[in-house]
Amino acid sequence: MYHYMTVASTSQRKPKGRYHHGDLREALIEAALAEVASNGPEAVSFSALARQLEVSQAAPYRHFADCDMLLAAAATRAFADFNAHLQAVVARRRKGSDLARMAHAYVAFGLRHTGTYRLMYASRHLADAPIDSPLHQAAEAGFLYFMSLLDVGEAGAERGEKRRARVAIKLLAGLHGVVMMAEQGLLPPRVQKVTMAELVDDLVRDAETAMEQTA
């Protein structure tokens, strides 16, 4: 049985203190991700990060034109980490189908790491990024992996791929809706955590049933 935490847990990324020389760009990304995890994307500022890392106020601008560019880089890193996490969960093969494990891991991540999830899926950074940007590539890699877990069955290659993309989008839309409604307190008060898990199971079953259809 899957259980979800509806309150964000403490991120594994800890805010870094003084910058001790080295890769400032990397230090800024890590510090931004830690701030996002703790207080959300809107809390990130160059001035605060510069004070935290004990560098000049001008130093961040040597690596990023503005805070939006830094947050786009942080979102790219977050997508890469998230994709690796989902693949590791699927590889454990503990219970359920690969698709079910990934779906439950997706929702669990969104509920436990609300700030990071909002940076990835509920901010303008992905929409504003060029289609060939590292951010779009990282986001697309996760979607393609999600698609790979949907069996096209006996359908022809072209028709099967179109159906797989359509079903994957519908499933992700459902999972995203569960995360956002739970995070914003929009689910009915009587809905228990186990019911949320059952809802995810229903979404997965609907996706698997859709992939079994030949029409």
Model segments located where?
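Hydrophobic alpha-helical connector segments
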Residues: A73, Q87-T116, E140, E161-L171
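Short secondary-structure transition hinges
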Residues: A108-S148, M180, P189, K193
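An amphipathic alpha-helix adjacent to DNA-recognition modules
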Residues: G22-E30, A37, E42-A43, E54, ...
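Amphipathic alpha-helical packing segments from all-alpha helical-bundle domains
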Residues: P130-A155, A165-I169, V194-T209
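Append "Primarily bacterial transcriptional regulators
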Residues: V44-R51, P60
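N-terminal intrinsically disordered/low-complexity leader segments
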Residues: M1-D23, E212-A215
